[in-house]
Every structure is written in structure tokens, then in C-alpha cells.
Regions:
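Metal-ion/cofactor- or nucleotide/acyl-coenzyme-handling active-site neighborhoods
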Residues: 1-148
């Protein structure tokens, strides 16, 4: 896919909670979960239940490719699942926004899992691939502070 993909988590992006995908990201495809106000997204994933009335297609499951690789990778959160889905569909310019994963369980388990999924995509792609994440760990040893 040549089009840039934005995967939106549930956290505010640049201080905004209410986002209109067609206005805020006009030249991009936008995927999100159906629990917060994102208007005009191209896909809504129902991993957390629907708390809004989506105005685009709703996906309730991931592809068999993602299911197969989840036996090798810790796909324990919706952002990881959507990232792998995008990778297997051929997206090569992906930006992860609104997913800092700073709550305790997210920080300890989901953030490292997403980092591993990003590494899988970057390491296994035969094509040029760009993945940016606004919540990426700044320190490789960030987990150690909870081991004391």
C-alpha cells in the first residue's frame, strides 16, 4: 500500500480527543478502536466493544496471518493486532498515535509487546518500511524500575 496509515489508540492526540479523520489526516487511511470519538475512520476494530456509533466498517477479528504469528509474538493488545494486520496487508508507512501505554499493566506488558511487533515488521519486511510510534520506549531498560 502506498497510502500512509494512521493507527489511533484511545489516548488524546496532541491534546485532542475528538478527531475527524478526514479533516485531521486527509491524505491518510485511519484505523481505530470503537471506544472513543473518531469520526470518518476507515476502519473501527471492536476489540474493546463499541461505545460509539461508527460511521465506517467494523472489524471484529484479525486475519489468519495475524493469528498464526501470534503464537510467536505477544499480541496482547489491539494496537499490536492492528499493526500486524496492516503489515500483512502491505502497508509500509504506518504511524501509531494516541497509544502511549502508560498505565501500569499497559506499561509492563503491552508496551514491550508492541515494541516486539514493530521489530518483527521492521525485521521481516523485504520492502522499505517506516513505522513511527509516539509512545515508543525511550530507554531499553525501562522495565527494570518495576523489578526492584
Amino acid at each position: 500500500m502506498n497510502k500512509k496509515l494512521i493507527i489511533l489508540g484511545k489516548a488524546p492526540v496532541q491534546g485532542k480527543r475528538g478527531i475527524d479523520a478526514k479533516v485531521d489526516y486527509p491524505d491518510c487511511e485511519v484505523w481505530t478502536v470503537g471506544t472513543h470519538r473518531i469520526k470518518n475512520a476507515d476502519r473501527y476494530y471492536e476489540f474493546h466493544g463499541l461505545k460509539i456509533s461508527p460511521d465506517g466498517p467494523v472489524f471484529r477479528d484479525v486475519s489468519n496471518d495475524v493469528k498464526a504469528v501470534s503464537s510467536l509474538l505477544p499480541v496482547n493488545n489491539s494496537i499490536s493486532a492492528m499493526l500486524l494486520e496492516a503489515y500483512f496487508e502491505g502497508y509500509r508507512d504506518i504511524e501509531l498515535l494516541g497509544c502511549p501505554m502508560i498505565a501500569r499493566d499497559e506499561y509492563l506488558k503491552q508496551k514491550p509487546a508492541l515494541a516486539m511487533c514493530i521489530g518483527f515488521c521492521l525485521g521481516n519486511s523485504r520492502d522499505s518500511i517506516q513505522i513511527s510510534w509516539d509512545g515508543a520506549p525511550e530507554n531499553v531498560k525501562y522495565y527494570e524500575e518495576y523489578q526492584k
